Amino acid sequence: MARKNLGRRKIELVKMTNESNLQVTFSKRRSGLFKKGSELCTLCDAEIAIIVFSPSGKAYSFGHPNVNKLLDHSLGRVIRHNNTNFAESRTKLRIQMLNESLTEVMAEKEKEQETKQSIVQNERENKDAEKWWRNSPTELNLAQSTSMKCDLEALKKEVDEKVAQLHHRNLNFYVGSSSNVAAPAAVSGGNISTNHGFFDQNGNSTSAPTLPFGFNVMNRTPAGYNSYQLQNQEVKQVHPQYWARYY
């Protein structure tokens, strides 16, 4: 009689309940996985890192050329990628700040340029206005003629004020010095006659006395006297033509 078998059938993948079978299966499958990884490295010159943890928590690893080197390389890529993103964000922020600063500088430059143009225009207009006297009145338009008239009136007003100030100053000078009378010129030699008409309080005519020969009119010093003799005495002479003076 022929023996019957189950034949091929699909085995359901579930966790083994038998502890011994579990350990044996893990050991076989781990060795096979590491063997396949070694073949892949040999055939394709690939870099492989395999880490397996047993049901008890023990770790097993396989790597080519080195597990630690591959792990550091993989982690370094992640850190480098993060650093690259941070650098890009920082660069974008810096560029944005520089663009804002550039915009402000350009606005200030345009404002200064407008101010400069306005100043140059005002200087040109003032320079042209200062040459109004060089142009003939027939060459001026209505606005220029009106401006010229106002300037002439203002100039005339300033000149009149200056003339009035000078006239008032000269008038005060003459009023303050009206009491001063010029002394007569000195005459040397002979008798000096000062017969000029004078009147006293009663209206009677008087005449100045004749000075003796050698009498100095300017210092009233008779002939034969020197200045040393007059230093010890006070000489007071009243001339009828002038008020009382002390010499």
From Swiss-Prot:
Coiled coil: 91-168
Listed SUPFAM superfamilies: SRF-like
GO MF terms, alphabetically ordered: DNA-binding transcription factor activity; protein dimerization activity; RNA polymerase II transcription regulatory region sequence-specific DNA binding
Gene deletion effect: No visible phenotype under normal growth conditions.
Statement: the UniProt record of this protein carries the keyword Oxidoreductase: no
GO cellular component: nucleus
Organ and tissue specificity: Expressed in roots, leaves and shoot apices.
This protein's UniProt keywords: Coiled coil, DNA-binding, Nucleus, Transcription, Transcription regulation
Domain MADS-box stretches: 6-66
GO biological process: positive regulation of flower development; positive regulation of transcription by RNA polymerase II
Pfam families tied to this protein: SRF-TF (PF00319)
Gene3D superfamilies assigned to the protein according to its UniProt record, in alphabetical order: Transcription factor, MADS-box
Additional facts recorded: Plants over-expressing AGL28 show an early flowering phenotype.
Name of the protein this chain belongs to: Agamous-like MADS-box protein AGL28
Organism annotation: Arabidopsis thaliana
